[in-house]
């Protein structure tokens, strides 16, 4: 998986993982306990998406977020 450097890349990674698991945006939203609009906005790279909820969405898709300092 490519490094995620911005909200648009994060959203694209979420969309790819969701589609690979054959989930609809609605199904993912229900699994996480959020609205479908949040999933749409997140996948479209909305920069004001809530970080905590975005992490929950990633976790629901089996994505672990790791931070690393650039050298």
Language-model region placement:
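Recognition helix of helix-turn-helix/homeodomain-like DNA-binding domains
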Residues: 33-47
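Short basic helix-loop element that most often maps to the first helix and adjoining turn
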Residues: 12-27, 31, 56
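Short amphipathic alpha-helix starts
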Residues: 7, 39, 66-68
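Short, conserved catalytic or interaction motifs in soluble domains
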Residues: 44, 69-70
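DNA major-groove recognition helix of helix-turn-helix/homeodomain DNA-binding modules
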Residues: 33, 52-68
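A detector for short, charged/polar N-terminal pre-domain segments
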Residues: 1-9
């Amino acid at each position: 998986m490519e490094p995620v450097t911005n909200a648009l890349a994060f959203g694209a990674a979420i969309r790819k993982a969701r589609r690979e698991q054959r989930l609809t945006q609605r199904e993912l939203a229900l699994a996480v306990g959020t609205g479908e609009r949040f999933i749409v906005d997140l996948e479209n790279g909305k920069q004001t998406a809530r970080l905590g909820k975005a992490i929950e969405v990633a976790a629901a898709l089996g994505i672990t977020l790791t931070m690393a300092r650039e050298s």
